[in-house]
Amino acid sequence: MGLFSFDGGKKESQPPNTRSQRKLCWESRDAFFQCLDKADILDAMDPKNSKSIKSHCKVENEKFEENCAHSWIKYFKEKRVIDFKREQTIKRIEQEAKQRERNQ
């Protein structure tokens, strides 16, 4: 410890970034997202969903937050919403294309 180092008396432990830790993180993420799907919750970052998440997916959320780095958690939650919107847009475009083909 250096003369001027200061950690505020609190150390935040980050899981090591090893292959096995990443695998554990992904498995925890998948279990949490599966629980969200069952509870019909899309956006885990929306404060409106926090009560539902606590009542339906508390254990899965705790494991996810325990096994993944904070930056990964935020990324995965945001990516879930973006991927859903992307899939919906693709479906809509495909349906519109089919409709145009039928009308010709």
From Swiss-Prot:
Entries under InterPro entries matching the protein: COA6_fun, COX6B-like, CX6/COA6-like_sf
Cell location: Cytoplasm; Nucleus; Mitochondrion intermembrane space
Entries under Pfam families matching the protein: COX6B
Span list, region Disordered: 1-22
PROSITE patterns the UniProt entry points to: CHCH (PS51808)
BP GO terms, sorted: intracellular copper ion homeostasis; mitochondrial cytochrome c oxidase assembly; respiratory chain complex IV assembly
Domains (record comment): The Cx9C/Cx10C motifs are involved in the recognition by the mitochondrial MIA40-ERV1 disulfide relay system and the subsequent transfer of disulfide bonds by dithiol/disulfide exchange reactions to the newly imported protein.
Full protein name: Cytochrome c oxidase assembly factor 6
Species this protein is from: Saccharomyces cerevisiae (strain ATCC 204508 / S288c)
Underlying gene: COA6
